[in-house]
Amino acid sequence: MAISLFCYSSRAAEDVKGILNLLTVQHPGLFAEKFLISRVDDLKNPTTYSDSVSVEIALEHDMRASCLFLVDLNDKSAASLLPTVEAIIKSALGDSNVLILFNNEERR
């Protein structure tokens, strides 16, 4: 079974891209091997993203999301590190600026 963290952020997509790039440099063993970070989808740009469902999912959790990215578990033996990954992302983006949903369903 695939495990993904759906990460919605109220920060601008370009800001999030920069922060995620920094995280991959700071934690190469974590984000280059055990977990994979997807590209950042700009939910505010209708030419690059037209799925309003993602915006609605975030709104259901009181988040006005500007962007979305996924963190996929690449190494099944690293599943116990999910709370660590969540904490790193929340710390980097600001806890109030990010909504993390386990498989796009369960709030973390």
Indicate where each model-derived feature is located.
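Short, extreme N-terminal segment that most often corresponds to the first beta-strand
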Residues: 1-32
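Generic alpha-helix signal with a bias toward terminal, lower-confidence helices
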Residues: 17-20, 35, 81, 85
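Conserved short beta-strand edge segments in small beta-sheet-based binding/regulatory domains
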Residues: 29-37, 96-103
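Ser/Thr-rich, low-complexity intrinsically disordered terminal regions
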Residues: 33-49
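Charged interaction segments
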Residues: 44-108
